[in-house]
Curated annotation (Swiss-Prot):
Residues on Cytoplasmic side: 45-55, 119-141, 225-238, 292-320
Regions of this protein lying in the Extracellular compartment: 1-23, 77-97, 163-203, 260-270
Keywords, sorted A to Z: Cell membrane, Disulfide bond, G-protein coupled receptor, Glycoprotein, Membrane, Olfaction, Receptor, Sensory transduction, Transducer, Transmembrane, Transmembrane helix
Principal cellular location given in the protein's record: membrane
GO CC terms in record: membrane; plasma membrane
Protein name per UniProt: Olfactory receptor 12D1
InterPro entries with a match to the protein in the record: GPCR_Rhodpsn (IPR000276), GPCR_Rhodpsn_7TM (IPR017452), Olfact_rcpt (IPR000725), Olfactory_GPCR (IPR050516)
Length: 320
């Protein structure tokens, strides 16, 4: 059955209806977007260029930085455009594409965090077998697998949403196209779409979350009951602190949005929580990893010296 929609475009009503705030919000979110792309881009380049960071942990960190750059680029450029535009329209195809990439990158990031937690579990609980278990082939296979699962999960949502009939209002009370606000505009039966959102997306969100918690549970019990050393426990948890903070930043708003969507939360609440995981989390991830990770800070300092040192040589030679 072909899509019989009569709607050719949607109107994204944005973050706020107060026109006086639009220029201010444009500057704020443009700054956030620049910091997010620059910070995650710097981590990605450092992980690629520094041989000391060619390990499974930083391989996955590079994947996370790449995801965060793409993730924020799915929603923020259109949001910035709409801050300065009177006609805040997005085409039907553009809306479905935005929905697809949003769920593709979001679900991939959720699974990636679970893989990163497993990597920490192997490193702490099975240190002698770490290089054997987390070999480059396995790391590459896991990365490709979660990217593919995320893609096909998003494809399912985008195909099912594109087949709905939109025959009424085209005003989306959100700053980007997502499944939940689109289902509110659809005519006809959306029970299957609601089921996909609750069950499939809920499983992809909650499954990795519980696997992450399970990894940390095994790490804590292993160190506490087998080593009986609080100092080792504190040291191990310190190395995992950055990852755990990122997990909390991502899952707190995601759980609020997708697990409680059936309770009828307002669109204003949805927009606020969406800002947390689409805007705030990607910009905080590089800050968390650079501030709490000595290896990343060291690699960043070495990279800065490599980039700045030739300039000092040229400056001294020209003065001579």
């Amino acid at each position: 059955m072909l899509n019989t929609t009569s709607v050719t475009e949607f109107l994204l009503l944005g973050v706020t209806d107060i026109q006086e705030l639009q220029p201010f919000l444009f500057v704020v979110f443009l700054t956030i977007y620049f910091i997010s792309v620059a910070g995650n881009g710097a981590i990605l380049m450092i992980v690629i260029s520094d041989p000391r960071l060619h390990s499974p942990m930083y391989f996955f960190l590079g994947n996370l930085s790449c995801l965060d750059i793409c993730y924020s680029s799915v929603t923020l450029p259109k949001m910035l455009q709409n801050f300065l535009s009177a006609h805040k329209a997005i085409s039907f195809l553009g809306c479905i594409s935005q929905l697809h990439f949003f769920h593709f990158l979001g679900s991939t990031e959720a699974m990636l965090l679970a893989v990163m937690a497993f990597d920490r579990f192997v490193a702490i609980c099975k240190p002698l077998r770490y290089t054997v278990i987390m070999n480059p082939q396995l790391c590459t296979q896991m990365a490709i697998t979660i990217w593919m699962i995320g893609f096909f999960h998003a494809l399912l949502h985008s195909l099912m949403t594109s087949r709905l009939n939109f025959c009424g209002s085209n005003r989306i009370y959100h700053f980007f196209c997502d499944v939940k606000p689109l289902l509110k505009l659809a005519c006809g039966n959306t029970e299957l779409n609601q089921w996909l959102l609750s069950t499939v997306t809920g499983t992809i969100a909650m499954g990795p979350f519980f696997l992450t918690l399970l990894s940390y549970f095994y790490i804590i019990t292993h160190l506490f009951f087998k080593t009986h050393s609080f100092s080792m426990l504190r040291k191990a948890l310190s190395t995992c602190a950055s990852h755990f903070m990122v997990v909390i930043l991502l899952y707190a708003p995601v759980l609020f949005t997708y697990i409680h969507h059936a309770s009828g939360t307002s669109m204003d609440q949805d927009r606020i929580t969406a800002i947390m995981y689409t805007v705030v989390t990607p910009v905080l991830n590089p800050l968390i990893y650079t501030l709490r990770n000595k290896e990343v800070k060291g690699a960043f300092n070495r990279a800065m010296k490599r980039w700045l040192w030739p300039k000092e040589i040229l400056k001294n030679s020209s003065e001579a």
